[in-house]
Amino acid sequence: MAIKLKIKKGDTVKIIAGDDKGKTGEVLAVLPKEKKVIVKDCKVAKKTVKPDQEKNPEGGFVNKEMPIDISNVAKVEGE
């Protein structure tokens, strides 16, 4: 069963641990079953994309935000 989280989509949070410590950003998605959040422009990874006739005929790399554990973020109050 998923727990109730105090951080919601659209909230501003600060990263308090990890490689992006000190950065602030907006929550794009909350994953309550995994206890993780996705924060805009934080923990960005390069993903390889295969060539596709419709979406991306050339293929290449795409920057994608990866989930961060809920314990590594703190909600910024007053914004």
Curated annotation (Swiss-Prot):
GO MF assignments: rRNA binding; structural constituent of ribosome
Keyword annotations of the record: Ribonucleoprotein, Ribosomal protein, RNA-binding, rRNA-binding
Keyword Ribosomal protein appears in the UniProt entry: yes
Paired cysteines (S-S): none
GO biological process assignments: translation
A Pfam family annotated for this UniProt entry: KOW
Subunit structure: Part of the 50S ribosomal subunit.
Protein name: Large ribosomal subunit protein uL24
Upper lineage: Bacteria, Pseudomonadati, Campylobacterota, Epsilonproteobacteria, Campylobacterales
